Amino acid sequence: MIHRSIARLTLACGVLASAFAANLAHADACPAHYVDGRKPEISNPKLDVATQELCYKVFGVMHSGITRTPLWSAEHLTADKLDAAQDLSRENSFHAERKLPAAQRAELADYARSGFDRGHMAPNGDMPDRQSQRDSFTLANMVPQDARNNRYVWAGIEGAVRKMAKKEGDLYVITGPAFIGGNLRKVGRVIVPSHLYKAVYSPRQRAGAAYFIENVDTKQYEMLSIAQLEDRIGIDLLPSLTRQQKLRMLSLPKINSKSKK
């Protein structure tokens, strides 16, 4: 169940959405980041308002003007890209996304003194060059994330997926927030997700699975099939696959939660 605050914002954002209609529909604008070139499909109508797809060189985002976060960030990870990323030092460049309408985007002030990290969905550590790294620091790719969650168990999940991608040769990865339950918070104008997920699909094994974790200081996480995850979040992440294919579980590595960014 999506929090009532999202529903209350839907009407206002719908008016804004019509004003920016030319910018809000970019069907399959960044197919290279998606399995079979097909982007996820939103099945929960409360989420499918004031959305805008943003395409960057190595990842794509579906942004919500209601939550002022991504609904997902999608990547096609390859061993070559990750080898390049490994040699790139981190340079922080957090910034608001000027491609989005001002009323629908997060600003740095929304996160200031909130106690939450600005949590990457497509991680900085996956970025193979400076421009892609800077792109990853857009707030359109961020959610308010529990600081210890972000720096420990989530960092462990990101690192495990990178290692797996190098071993497999390539993986498709979709990362995003989930807004579940009736007690969602806001920081500034940005809605804090209740959970986070990272879905992984291996073309070689023709199987997928996902990490699913509450957005709190925790070491606990679930491993779900893609079908199970889709049922929870209201998004068809891999629309080119059948439900039976989505039930086939990819073996994901267990996480060392001692990791720190």
Where are these regions (language model features)?
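Sec-dependent signal peptide recognition
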Residues: R4-A12
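Domain-level detector for secreted/extracellular nuclease and nuclease-toxin modules, and
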Residues: I2-H3, L16-K261
